[in-house]
Amino acid sequence: MKTFSAKAHEVTREWYVIDATDKVLGRVASEVAHRLRGKHKPEFTPHVDTGDFIIVINAGKLRVTGNKATDKKYYRHSGYPGGIYETTFGKMQERFPGRALEKAVKGMLPKGPLGYAMIKKLKVYAEATHPHSAQQPKALEI
């Protein structure tokens, strides 16, 4: 018996929708990263993008446990001396709902061309509506 290796043109991708209302950020992010990578499939191959498309709705209603809403910090830098900016999870959810989830998932995926292709299959929406009903996504419960 030979070892199976998936080919990029033979991969079939499903569409899934996740309702993130009152779900914990890290638990949703780890499941999304797992499925974007394709590790839930028997034909998973590390060097081929075998993952599915994931739609996350109600990302503005994600929560974190403990005091992380005020204590968890996100940093960015302008590139200039002294140009570091920080924001908390709570403020980021107010200004850009869903960005915290995108950053969490992106950190869990491989770095490089394969990881960049995987993150493009993630669609995050702050509200309950999404424009992907034509793909007939299946509900995924976490």
Swiss-Prot record:
Cellular component terms per the entry's GO annotation: cytosolic large ribosomal subunit
Keywords: Ribonucleoprotein, Ribosomal protein
GO biological process, one term: negative regulation of translation
Cross-referenced Gene3D superfamilies: Ribosomal protein L13
Pfam family, one: Ribosomal_L13
The protein's assembly and partners: Part of the 50S ribosomal subunit.
Family the UniProt entry places it in: Belongs to the universal ribosomal protein uL13 family.
Name of this chain's protein: Large ribosomal subunit protein uL13
